[in-house]
């Protein structure tokens, strides 16, 4: 899978895609695996690119609530290495994950 990061003045949108990854026959498990791998990379990219403010993550749709909870826990765990304070607000009704990350510098290169 791969992620796309779009920064605007209002917020940063991160889109998770499967790419050519097909995995096994269980679609939910394939989606969950791609989303888990993306979560670790997203936390890393937030630090490397010093992305702050409102962040919306558009994961590949997961239908099992337990998988969504695991993604939130993994993101929280991955962000613990980050000195910048983040707050994960959870999934919206549109299955978008809302979070905020404190802006540490004025970064105008959208």
Give a label for each model feature:
Residues 1-110:
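Conserved glycine-centered short motifs in functionally critical loops
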